[in-house]
Each structure stands twice: as C-alpha cells, then as structure tokens.
Amino acid sequence: MKLILLGAPGAGKGTQATFICQKYGIPQISTGDMLRAAVKAGTPLGIEAKKVMDSGGLVSDDLIINLVKERIAQPDCAQGFLFDGFPRTIPQADAMKAAGVKIDYVLEIDVPFEAIIERMSGRRSHSASGRTYHVKYNPPKVEGLDDVTGEPLIQREDDKEETVAKRLEVYSAQTRPLVAYYSDWATEAPDEAPKYRAISGTGTVEEITERAFKALSN
C-alpha cells in the first residue's frame, strides 16, 4: 500500500495516518522527519540539506525527491508507505511523477474550513500537565479552568483563529490544487495514475477510520 494522504491542517490526517499505518504495516513518512533523519545520519543528501537549512534557505524540490527515493528504498518500505504532508505543491507532484515514484492511492480527508476553524480554535490546554479540552466538544467543568488543579487554561498560538485561518489560506493556495491534480489524472489515465479517493472527515474518529479503510479496499 503506497499512499498519499491529503487534507487541510486540522482535518485529522495525523490520527488517520496512525490507524492506516498500523493496519497495513507501513511507515508514515513526513518530509520533516525524513530531512532530520538524513541530516542526523550524515548521508550525502543529508549534508547537502543541512547546508541549505543552516543558511536559512528552503530545501529544493529536487533534493526532497532524491531524499524520498532514498527513504522509500529502505527495508521498512517493502510493503509500502504513507506520505503525510508530501507532495505539498504541484511542482513536487510533477517531480515525483517524473522520478517514477509509484503510488497506489491518494486519499483526501475532506473537512469544511468552518468546521476546522471551530475544531482548532476551540482547543484549550493546561500547560503544566498537557491536559487538553475543547470549549464545545470536551469543556472543562468550570469554564477556562483545569479540572484537576483549577489553574487557568491557555489557547496555544497555533490554535488561535487567525493562525488557523492563515494556515488554511496557505493550504488553499499551495496544496489544495493537488486534489484536482490527482483526481483529473485518475480520470484521464486510470491505468497509470494512483486511485483517487475522497472521504468526509467529519464525525467520530471511528466513523472516519471506517470510511478510510473502505475507500482503500476498492
């Protein structure tokens, strides 16, 4: 099972990736982890990437694709792999196609942006313990206070509505076009393109997992 998982930030990709990887016995590959591992291992590509990152530059798509090819050739990818957050742009998808990286499925987890904003901006946490709450779905007993200590809860910078909206804007501009890219390719060249599947990402975690497994079995 060679899979690309698509979806906006906050759509629940991380949760579903864990279940999919467990079911199929495949590793989850994110470009961030891959870059860090290559830099740590001191591979030629890792050394090259480190130079770019140390100078504050962005790692080129060519370098990322070469790292991807190196990573998926490792033994733990024999049964397949799941790409999370890659490709992020059309040029990366084109480069992956040109490099002959074969993918079986592209699975999109589709959640309306309003639902994502509500889901993320409603999160609150107790910094000392890491306990998390949600103002609507899992509220504390007393508004704004931790159930155990009674200390004030905070809203992380990442969860503030304007931060979430900004991330969704970047996703709309850069990554959302991949939905059309893969669905069009699947329609035009079904024999060589990955199978494209979209599922709704609203509902319980169990419902979404069930939809994901069903989509990947046909």
From Swiss-Prot:
GO terms for molecular function: adenylate kinase activity; ATP binding. Disulfide bonds: none annotated. InterPro entries: Adenyl_kin_sub (IPR006259), Adenylat/UMP-CMP_kin (IPR000850), Adenylat_kinase_CS (IPR033690), Adenylate_kinase_lid-dom (IPR007862), P-loop_NTPase (IPR027417). It comes from the Bacteria. GO terms for biological process: AMP salvage. Residues 30-59 are annotated as: NMP. Residues 122-159 are annotated as: LID. It catalyses: AMP + ATP = 2 ADP. It is found in: Cytoplasm. One of its GO terms (cellular component) is cytoplasm. PROSITE patterns: ADENYLATE_KINASE. CDD domains: ADK (cd01428). Keywords: ATP-binding, Cytoplasm, Kinase, Nucleotide biosynthesis, Nucleotide-binding, Transferase. Its EC number is 2.7.4.3. Belongs to the adenylate kinase family. Monomer. Catalyzes the reversible transfer of the terminal phosphate group between ATP and AMP. Plays an important role in cellular energy homeostasis and in adenine nucleotide metabolism. PANTHER family: NUCLEOTIDE KINASE. Consists of three domains, a large central CORE domain and two small peripheral domains, NMPbind and LID, which undergo movements during catalysis. The LID domain closes over the site of phosphoryl transfer upon ATP binding. Assembling and dissambling the active center during each catalytic cycle provides an effective means to prevent ATP hydrolysis. This is Adenylate kinase.
